[in-house]
Amino acid sequence: MSRIGRLPIDVPAGVDVSVDGQHVTVKGPKGELSLTIAQPIRAEVQDGQVLVTRPDDERESRSLHGLTRSLIANNIVGVTTGYTKGLEIVGTGYRVALKDKGVEFALGFSHPVYVEAPAGISFTVEGVNKMTVVGIDKQLVGETAANIRKIRKPEPYKGKGVRYAGENVRRKAGKSGK
């Protein structure tokens, strides 16, 4: 039995979880998320808890059991508290500013880079070199932050670029002078 999958998921007050076949819908104060679970796995709501079960001990069922339980738990956390991912912009002249429904970056290119917020995602900017990606879908928040970081990854010599808040960038020594 999966150690993660067998744990029941507590449903907090103000959150409604409904299971319709293979579709799980989670509604809460911050919004609504839906999830389609893989075929052999079953989910059911009992006594304010969500129980995830699997029919057999085949390899595929075992691997999907804990995954499904974690995805449902992430959706419950998302609609109650939400998810955030902080980004820092490091470098001389590198900056970020809110513009329309997205953010505009100056990252040393010959042109500014504009990133529009996907549906369900919002950006907050603190100063000119810190920003936060906010949303209820953990996967979408992480993917959006990764796409922004990908525009200008931190380089190893000076550390310039977009990095996650608190990320350690491995630094290299430069060329040794004569």
From Swiss-Prot:
HAMAP family, A to Z: Ribosomal_uL6_B
Family in the record: Belongs to the universal ribosomal protein uL6 family.
Recorded superkingdom: Bacteria
Record organism: Clavibacter sepedonicus
InterPro entries, alphabetized: Ribosomal_uL6-like (IPR000702), Ribosomal_uL6-like_a/b-dom_sf (IPR036789), Ribosomal_uL6_a/b-dom (IPR020040), Ribosomal_uL6_bac-type (IPR019906), Ribosomal_uL6_CS (IPR002358)
GO molecular function: rRNA binding; structural constituent of ribosome
Known function: This protein binds to the 23S rRNA, and is important in its secondary structure. It is located near the subunit interface in the base of the L7/L12 stalk, and near the tRNA binding site of the peptidyltransferase center.
Summary of subunit composition and partner proteins: Part of the 50S ribosomal subunit.
SUPFAM superfamilies assigned to the protein according to its UniProt record, in alphabetical order: Ribosomal protein L6
Cellular component terms (Gene Ontology): cytosolic large ribosomal subunit
Gene3D superfamilies to which the protein is assigned, alphabetical: Ribosomal protein L6, alpha-beta domain
Keywords: Ribonucleoprotein, Ribosomal protein, RNA-binding, rRNA-binding
Gene Ontology process terms (BP): cytoplasmic translation
Pfam families according to UniProt: Ribosomal_L6 (PF00347)
Protein name: Large ribosomal subunit protein uL6
